[in-house]
Amino acid sequence: MSLVYLLIAILVIMAMILLMSKRRALAKYAGYIALVAPVISSIYFLIQIPSVAKLQYLSTSIPWIKTLDINLDLRLDGLSLMFSLIISLIGIAVFFYATQYLSSRKDNLPRFYFYLTLFMFSMIGIVLSDNTILMYIFWELTSVSSFLLISYWYNNGDSQFGAMQSFMITVFGGLALLVGFIMLYIMTGTNNITEILGQADHIKNHGLFIPMIFMFLLGAFTKSAQFPFHIWLPRAMAAPTPVSAYLHSATMVKAGIFLLLRFTPLLGLSNMYVYIVTFVGLITMLFGSITALKQWDLKGILAYSTISQLGMIMAMVGIGGGYAQHQQDAIASIYVFVLFGALFHLMNHAIFKCALFMGVGILDHEAGSRDIRILSGMRQLFPKMNLVMTIAALSMAGVPFLNGFLSKEMFLDALTQTGQLSQFSLISMIAIVFVGVIASVFTFTYALYMVKEVFWTKYDSKVFTKKNIHEPWLFSLPSLILMVLVPVIFFVPNIFGKGIIVLALRAVSGGNHQIDQLAPHVSQWHGFNIPLLLTIIIILLGSVLAIKVDWKKVFTGKIRQISVSKSYEMVYRHFEKFATKRFKRVMQDRLNQYIIMTLGIFMIIIGYGYIRIGLPKVHQLHVSEFGALEIILAIVTVTIGISLIFIRQRLTMVILNGVIGFVVTLFFIAMKAPDLALTQLVVETITTILFIVSFSRLPNVPRSNANKKREIIKISVSLLMALIVVSLIFITQQTDGLSSISDFYLKADKLTGGKNIVNAILGDFRALDTLFEGLVLIITGLGIYTLLNYQDRRGQDERE
């Protein structure tokens, strides 16, 4: 099956979900219909593993805009296969989990699952794209679908603000990424990613190479919540928990990492890129791990832990990026080891973090709270979630016999080996190891502290008063399956390492097939060494800090803390107030004022053009022959136009305005343009009738008395506009001996199959204009339809 067919299948499922929204009896099954999408894609990508392992990459190319080299280029290699499997398999768990989480009585299920399937479609589109512009389109589509999912409970103020904040930051990064893609096109003349990576040596010597890297980093850091662009992720926790489990732990936040991995053969050629990504990742890891301890909301803890873990992966991507410069050197194996660790932890993080979010969702759903100050001794009420969250949290902390331990060991090993790499000095290595270890200590601390406070403290019935708690098996099933994978991967890591991660490494290395020999063999025991010693230190210090320190009291002092999020919110509110004031000053609900402003700006632009280039000399002027009929029609039009200024009755004004339109129809007839005359007649008739019918249903509010100053402004604008239009007509006739474009249209209209030049222009020569005019009418119609069918919906933020 072609990659295009897979995307079409997902779109068909989305259409089915949308249709179900019209039938309330079927709406409750929307989740199970949507579940088909990740199941189909999972089966498809699993089947492709043997082909990709044999280097039989699947690719599809459909021409789209050839002149700009924008095509529907899709390619399935090892890297896209790994990410597609994560998106699809985690998608199955999340979609099924959502069927138990959401209520068919209180939630609009078709709308939710349409948004969720749209997001999955967008993410798969990103990882399969082999064209930069196509990747950008899918990139922004993830931002749009994420906005819709975060604001799903739209009556909730936190949901609205979180959705807007995440949208603004990620779209800003997306626009920066688009600039980077355009720079790549300027440097290479192609938008095809495979071809671009093949010209890496040429690109690195171009003057736009460094600016392009900065644009890429902005796109990646905003999408993957790296400091200081991390602030949108905690706010996004206002979304339903299935959204947090899918978008904000396993998929969307990994898009920035995917981008850097995909372009590592190019970006890694710059040492600056290696430094920036490594240090931003470590700073983000440290900041996220410390800030997680300040949170009382379980989803807040997981949000900052996600930021921290993404920083850890990003740091490894940065260190390993140097492989692009040292593919043939003896130290190449170190870079490959680091990149392998990044991909391995990316997979592990998706599993244990998704399980943690699901556990928190069940606690919130059944206990009605996520506050660790209220939840205590929950192991008695939620034994299954106690098991799930404890194992997943310990895996995140890097405890032995769990998958997170293996990738955390690889991370620590990577830090200690940076001193052997040409990009880092001994001092740099010491700083990197220090920051990485401190961040890991705090990671262990918040992971252990979270499960201790929620499950292993004494149950207090005075604080937690809710009764009749239950823990449904179907609700718990997805998180239990993910929990089982955590120790399984620890005991058989090389099934995933050799079967999936090595295939991804081939793509990250730029197609170097010798990567198979350089890829590490993951072992549970690798002897007493520095990484193991660091792990023991981390576990001991983290345990002491988690057990002995009451972090609820540590961060409740009166010390004023600097918050990036609060700074953003302050700036956002300031600009919002500023914009509101200016908006009220300009938008005063007076249509004629809007028209005057619009025409005034137009006249200023034209006037500036006249000043810059000067008025052209009139050396030829073509005036059509006119007779008595044309003179009479012109006099009638001018007379009615002037009279409209002084008439105060609305109905009379509408009728006279219609008369002007009918006079224009007679002009077209006199000039032998029957098509235009018929069109003008129909439009004018319908418009006049609609105006009359509308006014007959509106209150009879007389037009205000004429204001001399206002009328003078109107007349002045009208006369100036008329003068400009006439002058533009004169200018178009001054050809200076050059051939007119009109001659081409007059001669080529027969080639289009049109009966006359007007039809040919509308249907062929300016077909895109006509198309978009039609789209404007369709959008207007949809807007009117929405207003007519609007019902005030409340209670969308309520959950069972």
UniProtKB/Swiss-Prot annotation:
GO terms for molecular function: antiporter activity. One of its GO terms (cellular component) is plasma membrane. It comes from the Bacteria. GO terms for biological process: monoatomic ion transport. Pfam families: MbhD, MbhE, Proton_antipo_M, Proton_antipo_N. InterPro entries: CPA3_Na-H_Antiporter_A (IPR050616), MrpA_C/MbhD (IPR025383), MrpA_C/MbhE (IPR046806), ND/Mrp_TM (IPR001750), Proton_antipo_N (IPR001516). Keywords: Antiport, Cell membrane, Ion transport, Membrane, Transmembrane, Transmembrane helix, Transport. It is found in: Cell membrane. It is a multi-pass membrane protein. The chain crosses the membrane at residues 1-21, 33-53, 78-98, 118-138, 167-187, 207-227, 241-261, 273-293, 300-320, 331-351, 387-407, 424-444, 472-492, 527-547, 595-615, 627-647, 651-671, 676-696, 712-732, 768-788. May form a heterooligomeric complex that consists of seven subunits: mnhA2, mnhB2, mnhC2, mnhD2, mnhE2, mnhF2 and mnhG2. NCBIfam families: PRK12646.1. Belongs to the CPA3 antiporters (TC 2.A.63) subunit A family. This is Putative antiporter subunit mnhA2. It comes from Staphylococcus aureus (strain MSSA476).
